[in-house]
Amino acid sequence: MKNWLKSLSFGALTAGVVATLSACSNNSTSGASQSYKKSMSWMTTSEVQTLDPDKMVDTASGEQANNVFEGLNRLNNKNQVVPGVATTTTQSKDGLTWTFKLRKNAKWSNGDPVTAQDFVYSMRRKLDPKTKSQQQNHFDSIVNAPEVMKGTKKPSSLGVEAKDKYTLVVHLTHATPYFKTLTATGWNPEDEKVVKKYGDKYGTASKYMVYNGPFTSSGWTGTNLSWKLKKNNQ
């Protein structure tokens, strides 16, 4: 959390929308154990529109995503791509195949493991025209992506596959040098059973979500102007 706090931006803040971040810590000093709570509040630039990672287009929702989700990779406070859920990212010589090895201890806030299939499902959902995601064109270099977005091919034909539980492979139609950056900024996993459980309510409030990032969202109802980010204990 220390590194994350360093990367927070406090510029261009506006009044009216307040978020609170809190975490509990246990420190041991001279053999004694001390429990304490840390919290901080800050103002966001606008209201959160959604917690659905496939439908986020505004800055406030994007800030939420950075805190409650973790993608294959992430950007550090110097905007460098560093490992997220993926421990390694490998590109083929021709640039058309990307392979990601995932951490085996990554979990959702409900205790489910984060697997390669969660990334396959999220990309299929993102590019499915039924989702109406405005992020689709970012990933149009994936095999069959244009056809899936047009509805002429099924999402299952997309060039994204889970080789095994913790190995994700992506096939591209042409080399995309910035693809690794895309995996750090616009591709978060989704727990399929949770998406299906909540249906149209998915992402409309804190309670209709599950999280795999360092924090979980609490208290956002979809319309209120304050909420909390709490430490993800998974």
Predicted stretch roles:
Residues 25-27:
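Bacterial signal peptide processing site
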Residues 172-234:
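Gly/Pro-rich hinge or "lid" segments in bacterial periplasmic/extracellular proteins
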Residues 2-10:
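Bacterial N-terminal signal peptides that target proteins for export
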Residues 43-93:
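N-terminal lobe/hinge region of extracytoplasmic solute-binding protein
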Residues 87-134:
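Aromatic- and charge-enriched surface segment that lines or borders ligand/interaction sites
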Residues 20-23:
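C-terminal motif of bacterial Sec signal peptides marking the signal peptidase cleavage site
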Residues 137-193:
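Surface-exposed binding/hinge segments that line
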Residues 36-49, 97-100, 119-122, 168-169, ...:
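Short, well-ordered beta-strand elements
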